[in-house]
């Protein structure tokens, strides 16, 4: 019989981790049939939000390592919205592996904790972790792949919240399939964030017969994610992920010079808020121009946590069903760069079919 808890470890105890941990506490008494702001599924399959238990935090920052997870999520430089107190969880934050996890700008504000890297694979086994969530900084290619090896060795499911291509990689997808383990990813698509809004508008233009000529999506915010992305060398996979998430909705070729999607700047006073500007220029009936402009303001990390809170439960369902490799439906709805792209309404139905057991994809 499956364990009726979802035991979750977190790599990278930053703002996204903070919102997720707060959210589990905040929504623990949510009723299954309520319409609840910020929640798609109070109960997802057999698992209510209160069934999510945290087992381990992994970080390198001296302000977090050695603390309880409930304390570390509020340590500097975290600066997201605090919407819930969190009691002591008796969940340690241990010293992780750095590799390329700290870039130029993060390295200026983060002091690495002393000591050696913890035995991550053994800790995941010892804590009976089911699912590991990756919240490392953008550009952490080597670090992510190092952690993936530990996760496979420990026998855990993997939810990849960042734009390092693991679930969408044929090599890594096969590694998880061969190990008999599920993976969801890559690069979390927030509840109502820049990517899904841009995708839906793109689909609307296409479905209504408006040819898309040019578009941009500019994003800026005040958290460490945007600070890190000032280092343009770390942005390649992020730009690919965000751009393809939009252009995959266009069934015809569009000049790459006419599409610009990506992070733009770091504005410290925005803290964990993100502001997004989207412009779309199209041609409609009679070759008449049609232009659209939109501004979106969100708190970045709660916006992602509302999706991750479902993704970890889908990963546990996949474990329960002994599914292996990339899980296509949840990956396509919850992430920017899944192994296979679907229109969002199709992906949404695939998630519901997966949850209900009508489909194992």
Feature locations, PLM:
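N-terminal glycine-/serine-/threonine-rich beta1-alpha1-beta2 phosphate-ribose binding loop
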Residues: 1-147, 235-240, 276
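Hydrophobic beta-strand scaffold residues
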Residues: 158, 182-183, 212
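Gly/Ser/Thr-rich loops at beta-strand to alpha-helix junctions
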Residues: 12-18, 137-142, 162-168, 189-195, ...
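Receiver (REC) domain switch-region micro-motif
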Residues: 132, 158, 290
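Rossmann-fold NAD(P)-binding glycine/threonine-rich loop
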Residues: 137-153, 161-182
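NAD(P)-dependent Rossmann-like dehydrogenase/reductase catalytic/cofactor-binding core
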Residues: 303-361
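Active-site-lining helix/loop region of Rossmann-like oxidoreductase modules
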Residues: 11, 50-53, 64, 72-78, ...
């Amino acid at each position: 019989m499956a364990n009726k808890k979802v035991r979750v470890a977190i790599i990278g105890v930053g703002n996204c981790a903070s919102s997720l941990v707060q959210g589990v506490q905040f929504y623990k008494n949510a009723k299954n049939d309520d319409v609840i702001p910020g929640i798609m599924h109070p109960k997802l399959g057999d698992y209510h939000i209160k069934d999510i238990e945290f087992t381990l935090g992994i970080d390198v920052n001296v302000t977090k390592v050695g603390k309880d997870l409930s304390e570390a999520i509020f340590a500097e430089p975290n600066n997201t919205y605090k919407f819930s107190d969190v009691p002591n969880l008796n969940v340690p934050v241990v010293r992780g592996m750095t590799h390329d996890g700290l870039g130029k700008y993060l390295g200026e504000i983060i002091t690495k904790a002393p000591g050696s890297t913890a035995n991550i694979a053994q800790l995941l086994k010892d804590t009976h972790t089911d699912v590991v969530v990756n919240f490392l900084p953008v550009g952490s290619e080597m670090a992510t792949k190092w952690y993936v090896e530990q996760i496979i060795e420990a026998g855990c499911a993997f939810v990849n919240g960042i734009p390092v291509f693991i679930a969408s990689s044929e090599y890594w997808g096969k590694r998880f399939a061969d190990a008999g383990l599920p993976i969801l990813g890559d690069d979390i698509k927030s509840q109502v964030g820049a990517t899904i809004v841009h995708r839906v508008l793109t689909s609307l233009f296409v479905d209504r017969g408006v040819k898309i000529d040019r578009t941009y999506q500019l994003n800026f915010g005040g958290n460490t994610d945007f600070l890190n992305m000032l280092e343009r060398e770390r942005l390649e996979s992020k730009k690919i992920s965000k751009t393809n998430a939009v252009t995959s909705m266009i069934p015809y070729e569009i000049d790459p010079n006419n599409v610009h999607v990506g992070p733009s700047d770091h504005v410290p006073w925005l803290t964990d808020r993100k502001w997004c500007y989207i412009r779309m220029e199209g041609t409609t009936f009679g070759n008449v121009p049609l232009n659209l402009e939109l501004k979106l303001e969100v708190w970045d990390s709660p916006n992602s946590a509302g999706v991750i809170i479902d993704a970890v439960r889908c990963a546990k369902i996949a474990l329960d069903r002994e599914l292996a490799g990339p899980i296509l439906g949840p990956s396509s709805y919850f992430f920017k760069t899944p192994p296979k792209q679907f229109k969002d309404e199709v992906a949404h139905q695939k998630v519901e079919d997966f949850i209900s057991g009508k489909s194992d994809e």
